Amino acid sequence: MKDLFLFSSLLDASHTFSYFFHIGLVALIAVIVAMMATRSMQLVPRGMQNLGEAFLEGVLSMGRDTMGSEKGARKYLPLVATLGIIVFFSNIIGIIPGFHAPTASLNLTLSLAIIVFVYYHFEGIRAQGFVKYFAHFMGPIKLLAPLMFPIEIVSHLSRVVSLSFRLFGNIKGDDLFLMVILALVPYIAPLPAYVLLTFMAFLQAFIFMILTYVYLAGATVVEEGH
């Protein structure tokens, strides 16, 4: 099956150009939406400001439930909300004919996963100290430390694979699904598919955000008795 037409191919047909073109487009859309939401701030929010505040409050509520505190939720709100915006717009743009979802490429999903991986370890070390943070990797029983430490290392590395491939696989699958639907029935029938794919774009962004909060909570929240 041939690839669907992409507007970026009018400038350059290479996959590398297409990837960076759509990444740049997502960044531009995010900036425009942010400017619209903050252009004329009012005490009683309306329009885009209302939508933006609802989004941030939703992310903050997610953070409170995951981190267990308002302080932790607010501290990581900029990172988690930014990741959510990038992932959502990268997902949703692929639903529009003539555009390609950047999250259907491992280049983006793996990059985002590595950012989360490095950052939550950095925050964990900063919150607990280097020795205490990695002492948790050895488990509560010292005799089992030689076994538990490599298992924990593999477990944490697998989070990069989980974050990146889950998002990549779902969005790539959505792209292929949409391509088949448009090839078979290009007019009225794809409408239910667009609804489903829009829901999936929201869902994958939500999952990425909540997993980021979960990993940050696991790294920075020190349980009593440890």
Curated annotation (Swiss-Prot):
Q: Does the keyword Protein transport apply?
A: no
Mode of membrane association: Multi-pass membrane protein
- Lipid metabolism as a keyword of this entry, yes or no, is no
Principal location: membrane
Q: Span of the secretion signal?
A: none
Record localization: Cell inner membrane
Query: Which GO-annotated molecular functions does the record name?
Result: proton-transporting ATP synthase activity, rotational mechanism
Gene3D superfamilies associated with the record: ATP synthase, F0 complex, subunit A
Q: Which GO terms describe its biological process?
A: proton motive force-driven plasma membrane ATP synthesis
- Superkingdom assignment: Bacteria
Q: Which Gene Ontology cellular component terms are annotated? A: plasma membrane; proton-transporting ATP synthase complex
For this protein, the record's Pfam families field holds: ATP-synt_A (PF00119)
Task: Return the CDD domains for the record.
Answer: ATP-synt_Fo_a_6
Membrane-traversing stretches:
17-37, 79-99, 105-125, 134-154, 176-196, 199-219
Keywords, in A-Z order: ATP synthesis, Cell inner membrane, Cell membrane, CF(0), Hydrogen ion transport, Ion transport, Membrane, Transmembrane, Transmembrane helix, Transport
Q: Which NCBIfam families match?
A: ATP_synt_6_or_A, PRK05815.2-3
Subunit (UniProt) = F-type ATPases have 2 components, CF(1) - the catalytic core - and CF(0) - the membrane proton channel. CF(1) has five subunits: alpha(3), beta(3), gamma(1), delta(1), epsilon(1). CF(0) has three main subunits: a(1), b(2) and c(9-12). The alpha and beta chains form an alternating ring which encloses part of the gamma chain. CF(1) is attached to CF(0) by a central stalk formed by the gamma and epsilon chains, while a peripheral stalk is formed by the delta and b chains.
**What's this protein's function?**
Key component of the proton channel; it plays a direct role in the translocation of protons across the membrane.
Family, according to the entry, reads as follows:
Belongs to the ATPase A chain family.
Name by which UniProt lists this protein: ATP synthase subunit a
